[in-house]
């Protein structure tokens, strides 16, 4: 994984964890959890691509990997919509910058996962 992507994930997760959004903090914690899960999934998919021979074991280990991939894309779309919504409603510039960076990162990761999945197909 690109070291800039790693630091971007870590930076955004750290910033999001510092935000105080009142009653919606439970939603924010859910977003943080999904961000972390997405990062781990992206890493494992990227590693499988790097070891192209691992495709066979990936399919054996997880016969439903396409279904899982579809689920991850749904999660990404949900996160993108949630981040866009937060971006529209927040007036705090720190939060706006954080959500803008999170949105950009999500779009980049979505593209990377698409690229990885096409290489695996």
Curated annotation (Swiss-Prot):
Keywords: Host nucleus, Host-virus interaction, Transport, Virion. Pfam families: Flu_NS2 (PF00601). One of its GO terms (cellular component) is virion component. It comes from the Viruses. Disulfide bonds: none annotated. Belongs to the influenza viruses NEP family. This is Nuclear export protein.
